[in-house]
Amino acid sequence: MVKVIFFDLDDTLVDTSKLAEIARKNAIENMIRHGLPVDFETAYSELIELIKEYGSNFPYHFDYLLRRLDLPYNPKWISAGVIAYHNTKFAYLREVPGARKVLIRLKELGYELGIITDGNPVKQWEKILRLELDDFFEHVIISDFEGVKKPHPKIFKKALKAFNVKPEEALMVGDRLYSDIYGAKRVGMKTVWFRYGKHSERELEYRKYADYEIDNLESLLEVLARESSSNKKVHPPRQQI
């Protein structure tokens, strides 16, 4: 019987794929507007390569961008990028469609809720607080505090311990097959793959670890209804909802 439901944050509860792309493009446009002597396509493609190399949480993307473009350090250009990025991020920050409605219903049904996410703790909490999602969750587990990222078992085991539940009493919902679904299944949790965002067609070799597949968060309620009505001792085969 499922007692606790864990959610990933990015592209599971918060629509970050579209947000990040818009923010990065606006940053480059604002840098050019303030004197960056490079065309948009060149600067943007270099920025994307930097993000691939250093990760999205690297704090010096725009500083390194100038180096890659063989340009001198210019705090005005860097500030223009930072300002446009953050202004866009705050303006476009949105929940995934249906997220709040589903969270409200899950609390009404008596489920305990948690978040298991990778990323910079300050940035992740900023998203949660700006969207006023914090009251839904008893615990928020962020990998940077643990020294490991999903799918490492440590972060999932810590989440289970926080709620004092067995793995079979927990269900993980996430958009990433490798980090969310494989990671949770490896410690014995039930899993729901949410096909959303830029990762919906990636890492398909890990699809077999999903007990259920959904295309919208409202379908999670149907998954839970099936789970609660099932008397089987084994997990049902993967089902598309």
UniProtKB/Swiss-Prot annotation:
| Keywords (A to Z) from UniProt | Hydrolase, Magnesium, Metal-binding
Query: What GO terms describe the biological role, i.e. biological process, of this protein?
Result: small molecule biosynthetic process
Q: Which cofactor does it need?
A: Mg(2+)
**SUPFAM superfamilies, alphabetized:** HAD-like (SSF56784)
| Catalytic EC class | hydrolase
Task: Return any one Pfam family short name.
Answer: Hydrolase
Q: Which NCBIfam families match?
A: CTE7 (TIGR02253), HAD-SF-IA-v1 (TIGR01549), HAD-SF-IA-v3 (TIGR01509), HAD-SF-IIIA (TIGR01662)
**Protein name stated in the entry:** Glyceraldehyde 3-phosphate phosphatase
